[in-house]
């Protein structure tokens, strides 16, 4: 778990945008918070897992994927903005994310 600050929030946003721009072969300027990961960008759930791995390494976290899976069933992610918010919650709360509601 990590205490979030504005710099971390901006870093997460940049990493997510750069990741999807590269994976989906589009410019970051074409991606907005409202961009649908699947229908607008052609992304998939494996990209979400890859991002979790990137952030867990970056912030030195051990995250149980089952916990994240349970949380995401209750809080599905469809847009880039929702994905960024979930990544921030994972970074901030780690495995305790399951206790959020």
Question: What kind of feature is each model-predicted range?
Answer:
Residues 2-43, 47-53, 57-101:
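Phosphopantetheine-dependent thiolation modules in NRPS/PKS and related acyl-activating systems
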């Amino acid at each position: 778990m990590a205490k979030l600050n504005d710099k971390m929030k901006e870093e997460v946003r940049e990493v997510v945008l750069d990741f999807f721009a590269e994976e989906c072969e589009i410019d970051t300027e074409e991606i907005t918070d409202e961009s649908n990961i699947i229908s607008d960008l052609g992304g998939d759930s494996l990209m979400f897992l890859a991002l979790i791995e990137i952030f867990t390494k970056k912030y030195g976290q051990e995250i149980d994927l089952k916990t994240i899976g349970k949380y995401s069933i209750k809080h599905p992610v469809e847009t880039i903005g929702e994905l960024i918010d979930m990544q921030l919650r994972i970074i901030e709360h780690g495995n305790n994310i399951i206790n959020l509601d």
